[in-house]
Structures are given as C-alpha cells and as structure tokens.
C-alpha cells in the first residue's frame, strides 16, 4: 500500500529559523532511530522464534522446501527476473549464509553438512528475510502468528511486518525518520474496534503516510514479545521532548502523524 502526500518544498527558510533548530531536530531524530532499532531487534527475534517453532514442527527444512509454503504466494513469478518468489528468497538466504561469520554456522556445516535446519537458519536472517518468508507461508500459518499478536487479519499483519522491515532499513541507514513520508505503508483493520488504537488512523491517509503509525505498530508488537517492556514509555518521554523552534513555523509531533489524544492509549 503506497500513498504519496502532496508537499511543496522551497529553498526559502522560514522567518527566524536558526541553525540550532536544525541541529536539535537532527539529534531528536537520531535518538528516535536508536529507540526504533532497539524495539525492532526484539521484534525480529520474536518473529524468528514464531516462524521456526511453527514451521519446524512439521518440517526441519521448511525454509528450503516450497511445498511447506503457500503454492501461490511462493510460486508467483517475478516478470523481471523470471524467478519465483521462493527462488528469489532462496537467493537472499544463500547470500546471508555465505556472508555469515557466525561460528555456529561454520561448526554446523562442518559437522552435519551444508543445509542448516530451520531453527539454526533463522539466526542469520535479517528482518527482510523474515518478512518475505512470512509472506510465503500458508494462510493458516500466517493467521496463527498474527493471532498471537492480537491481529485478526493475516493480511494486515503481513503488511505490518513488511512495513517494519522498511522502517528498520530507514533507521539502520541513518535516514531522516521523524517526519518522513513513508512509501511503504501498512494496512489497518477494515472495521473500527478490532484493535482499539488503530481507530485513530483508519481512513486518514495523512496519518497513515507518516512514521507515527509504524511506531504504534512497533509498540503493539513489542508489548507481546516483551510484556514487561518500558520501551513505549521511553518513546513517549522522547516525543514529549520534541525540540522547540525559533522559526515562525512551529513543528511538532503532529508532523509525525501523531493523532490527537494519542497519549491516552499509548501508555496502556
């Protein structure tokens, strides 16, 4: 799902803008990216466990076997390369395997052969590999994992994981985050009330296109992975310290896509 907001940028500075305004926004954004990476690391580990446990019960090498996945999702042919989605994922996995410097990879391959079982292979996957494999899984399997996170629609959950992978790439590559127009936008429940906090975003393209929605998804998922986490409280504290500007145009976390009254559900 991608939507572009119409924005007008000029080379003119807002009246009374000072250099310190740009510096403080940069520092705010830098800390925000660090907070995001902290959450996504734990969510990534949780998803690895979810996939390894579910698929590994039935097939030790499910990640190497297209028949363990949804035939349509895994068998879709990319027009540009002529390869199936599964084959493209295999290429990615082999690249991660070849680049891995982990001792356990070398040890296992020397002792047991070239193919890592699923519960070992997951340790070298990045967020993108996790997202792509999840998207190839059978509907019942995707829904089982989605349900663990309180999401009733597997398609919505799949889009959440994909968008968090995008968020992870932005944060890891030091891209500006706080007011970015997000080109990979997650889906939301069709009906209000399915996930209470989502109600503030449903049908609001201007909010869906901003990063606060992805922060909210990260909050939702990390509270499942780490029930006693205080990550969301640290994020709230950081957001409430949004830097004041000297310029006539006053920026705020509303420019991040934060809906009115977000604090009410964020701390729960």
Please annotate each region the language model reported.
Residues 1-268:
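Long, contiguous internal "core" modules enriched in hydrophobic/ aromatic residues
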């Amino acid at each position: 799902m991608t939507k572009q907001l119409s924005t007008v940028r000029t080379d003119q500075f807002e009246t009374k803008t000072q250099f310190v305004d740009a510096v403080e926004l940069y520092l705010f954004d830098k800390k925000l990216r660090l907070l995001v990476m902290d959450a996504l690391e734990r969510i990534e580990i949780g998803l690895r466990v979810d996939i390894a446990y579910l698929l590994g019960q039935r097939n030790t090498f499910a990640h190497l076997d297209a028949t363990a996945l949804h035939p349509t999702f895994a068998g879709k042919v990319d027009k540009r390369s002529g390869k199936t989605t599964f084959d493209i994922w295999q290429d990615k996995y082999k690249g991660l395997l070849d680049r891995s410097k982990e001792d356990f990879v070398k040890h296992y391959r020397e002792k047991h052969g070239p193919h890592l079982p699923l519960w070992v292979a997951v340790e070298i996957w990045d967020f993108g590999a996790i997202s792509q494999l999840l998207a190839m899984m059978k509907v019942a399997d995707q829904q089982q994992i989605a349900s663990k996170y309180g999401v009733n629609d597997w398609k919505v959950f799949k889009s959440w994981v994909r968008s968090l992978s995008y968020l992870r790439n932005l944060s890891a590559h030091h891209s500006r985050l706080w007011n970015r127009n997000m080109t990979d936008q997650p889906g939301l429940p069709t009906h209000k009330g399915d996930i209470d906090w989502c109600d503030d975003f449903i049908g609001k393209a201007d909010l869906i296109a901003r990063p606060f929605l992805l922060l909210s998804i990260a909050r939702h998922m990390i509270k499942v992975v780490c029930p006693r986490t205080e990550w969301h409280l640290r994020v709230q504290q950081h957001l409430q310290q949004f830097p004041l500007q000297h310029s006539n145009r006053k920026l705020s976390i509303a420019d991040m896509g934060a809906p009115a009254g977000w604090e009410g559900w964020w701390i729960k």
